[in-house]
UniProtKB/Swiss-Prot annotation:
This is Mediator of RNA polymerase II transcription subunit 21. Component of the Mediator complex, a coactivator involved in the regulated transcription of nearly all RNA polymerase II-dependent genes. Mediator functions as a bridge to convey information from gene-specific regulatory proteins to the basal RNA polymerase II transcription machinery. The Mediator complex, having a compact conformation in its free form, is recruited to promoters by direct interactions with regulatory proteins and serves for the assembly of a functional preinitiation complex with RNA polymerase II and the general transcription factors. Residues 85-125 form a coiled coil. Keywords: Activator, Coiled coil, Nucleus, Transcription, Transcription regulation. Belongs to the Mediator complex subunit 21 family. Its main location: nucleus. It comes from the Eukaryota. One of its GO terms (molecular function) is RNA polymerase II-specific DNA-binding transcription factor binding. GO terms for cellular component: core mediator complex; mediator complex; nucleus. The gene is SRB7. InterPro entries: Med7/Med21-like (IPR037212), Mediator_Med21 (IPR021384). GO terms for biological process: negative regulation of transcription by RNA polymerase II; positive regulation of transcription by RNA polymerase II; positive regulation of transcription elongation by RNA polymerase II; positive regulation of transcription initiation by RNA polymerase II; regulation of transcription by RNA polymerase II; RNA polymerase II preinitiation complex assembly. The keyword Nucleus applies.
Amino acid sequence: MTDRLTQLQICLDQMTEQFCATLNYIDKNHGFERLTVNEPQMSDKHATVVPPEEFSNTIDELSTDIILKTRQINKLIDSLPGVDVSAEEQLRKIDMLQKKLVEVEDEKIEAIKKKEKLLRHVDSLIEDFVDGIANSKKST
């Protein structure tokens, strides 16, 4: 799992991509409107003009995606240590987490030693079993 700052950076990158995709969609699919009554109707033979209702629905979806990403970013920002958390408190928390990590690492090392001991014991039992079968076949 990544840390909160990395998650925040990823979300900001995703939001930037969403903005670009939305602007690209608008640019490629918008209808043409006259600015004044006397102005001729503009058109672009390369543009794909989407029906107004479909265009509006797609814009609503894209806007909703951007809003959801904004909420996700705000939630990540809120989870970061705030201005109210002093440097000493942050250092104490880091020390506590480091001690906890050392304890967990010690437990892991003990578990690995126990596993290796059990594996040697199982290997010994298997060898004794195989030797017993081999000896019983020799005697018959």
